[in-house]
Amino acid sequence: MSKPPPKPAKPGQVKVYRALFTFDPRTPDELYFEEGDILYISDTSDSNWWKGTCRGRTGLIPSNYVAEQAESIDNPMHEAAKRGNLSWLRECLDNKVGINGLDKAGNTSLYWACHGGHKDVVEILLSQPNCELNQQNKLGDTPLHAAAWKGYSDIVEMLLNKNARTDVVNNEKKTALDMATNAQCASLLKRKLGGVILRTHSNAEEYLDDEDSD
């Protein structure tokens, strides 16, 4: 008895699979791929033939092949970010894989890149216009919490330069500064927090001055 076909992808949502066997096309429209190749399925509107991309080539793949002879990769961007795999990350971005997707623990790919100290991956993710900097996972931690806890001061600085929030507290009521494990991270976070406090104080004084002048 064959497995039921996978649920169709939502419009605009790319589903990613790893091929378990080589597929030999019978027509020019069909996509050739080998065992172990990554398949990016972008269009599942036809129940029999899905549109996919592999190694930069686009073509049709029988949906029953995907159901029976391919392994779903639920969070490819997260896997690439965890491993610091730049080429896979770029491939995910080229194939429109969602950048802010959450895994089961509520982590984004940016969180895993920060957690792993993969500066080059962090740089690419931060260059994307819709990258969510302050997403909290199920423990309440943000990418900034992860970088501070792991002691990656260069990544902390990159996040702060993109205006990551320093006032977010996790489930244990800790900010990124509370979790900083080295002096360099703590210093960067204190400086940023100091700037925020100074600006807030300055704004408050301006407000009071306005009140007095009324």
From Swiss-Prot:
The keyword Cytoplasm applies. Keywords: ANK repeat, Cytoplasm, Repeat, SH3 domain. Residues 12-71 form the SH3 domain. PROSITE patterns: ANK_REP_REGION, ANK_REPEAT, SH3. Signal peptide: none annotated. ANK repeats lie at residues 72-101, 105-135, 139-168. GO terms for biological process: signal transduction. It is found in: Cytoplasm. InterPro entries: Ankyrin_rpt (IPR002110), Ankyrin_rpt-contain_sf (IPR036770), SH3-like_dom_sf (IPR036028), SH3_domain (IPR001452). GO terms for cellular component: cytoplasm. Induces bone resorption, acting probably through a signaling cascade which results in the secretion of factor(s) enhancing osteoclast formation and activity. This is Osteoclast-stimulating factor 1.
